[in-house]
Amino acid sequence: EYSCECISYQGRHHVLAVTKKYTTGYPHFIETGHMEPPELSEIEMNRVKEFIPKALTALEIENGASHSEFKLDADGNVRIIEIGSRMGGDCIGSHLVYLSSGYDFVRMVIETALGQEPELTPAHEPMCAGIRFVFTKKDLDVLEEIKSKSPELLQMVSEMEPVGEHQVVDSGSRFGYYILAGKNQAEIKDWLER
């Protein structure tokens, strides 16, 4: 599963980032992490960047943020799950878009709300960014390993609830999270998938 993060101004849509979603799978499909950019082929990325703006236009979304969740079918076609006229949650809009693309999504949302054209100049070179949510002690062990082996990747660590105090049954019951960013996508992916 993926999502596409866009800013729109006066009916013009700008794709800022595409996000891969990691989940627990059936039965709850709780998101365990996200990564930007995803490992999609150039053809698949182009399909996303072409299809999602058309969907936003069809829904008459003209100004502000959007978070479009989708899957790719076996032929690589975009299949929309839902479109929210908002930034992505779980630190996607607030942190990952900026880290991965250099675009200040929060600022853009404010600018468009004020009727101003958003600033579309990236503040830095693109990177790979990811967030890992804490479900078990294993997630904390991975965090400690990152601190000792690759501390430069660690961008943020949330406050943590004591792990194991309750069962994680939805996004609101996760124990915390940490955010990573760096130039090497394979390295970020490895830390997210351990």
Task: Locate the predicted segments by residue.
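A short, polar/proline- and glycine-enriched secondary-structure boundary/capping micro-motif
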Residues: G25-F29, D90-S94, Q155
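Internal nucleotide-binding/catalytic subdomain
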Residues: E1-V78, M87
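Pre-DFG segment of protein kinase catalytic domains
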Residues: I80-E82
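Short, flexible turn/loop "capping" segments at secondary-structure junctions
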Residues: H28-F29, G89, V168-S173
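Generic structural signal for well-ordered, non-membrane alpha-helical segments
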Residues: S41-V48, G102, Q185-I188
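Peripheral (often C-terminal) accessory segments that flank ATP-dependent C-N-forming ligase machineries
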Residues: I110-R194
